Each structure stands twice: as C-alpha cells, then as structure tokens.
C-alpha cells in the first residue's frame, strides 16, 4: 500500500491495514517518499521508504522484493496505489493491483479481494 495519495485519504483508508492484519494477512507500506509518520508505519508489518532496497516504484523488482519480505508470493499480494505507473509495475510483478481514486470504491475492492469482513 502507498502512503501519499492513498493512506492520506482518510480514516477508512488508514483502517485497511489493520483490517487485513486482523484477518491474519501480512501488510506492507511501500512509499517513494523518505518520511512517513511513525503512527502510520506501525500499522504495517514491513515498511519500505525511498530507495531502501535499491530500486523505486514502479520497478517490478520493488514489488517482488516486498512480497519476499512478507514471505508471500507476488500473485497472492494486493497492492494499492494512486498512480497508474505504480499499478502497472505491481501487475508486471504478478500482483493484483488496485488504482485508488475513491475511498469507498477502494475500501470495497480491497475488502472483496482480501475477503475481509464488512465494516
């Protein structure tokens, strides 16, 4: 999941990682930015900021490496980002990717994809 443009879009978006974790799913925050509030970072199992792993989004290798950090095959990952180029990069890595435009739509789509209980 991305920070800027996604998690900054309100409480319902910020609740998604917690809902996923409550369902037993590992979570990751991947941001090209270098700073994310600690309170947001604590919502995730893995946090990758900037070029910490030697590449940046939309490079598919970023998404593959993060999936490996989660010990989850890329094809079992759902990535959410507001930028089409990053969605394409995640898809090229084999992930299901959701382009965020609208909070209600994204929360619904991710909930369905991850089989999360309704809120």
Give a label for each model feature:
Residues 1, 14, 25, 30, ...:
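Asp-based, Mg2+/Mn2+-dependent phosphohydrolase catalytic module
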Residues 1-10:
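Asp-based phosphoryl-transfer active-site loop
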Residues 13-21:
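Short amphipathic alpha-helical segments and helix-helix/interface helices
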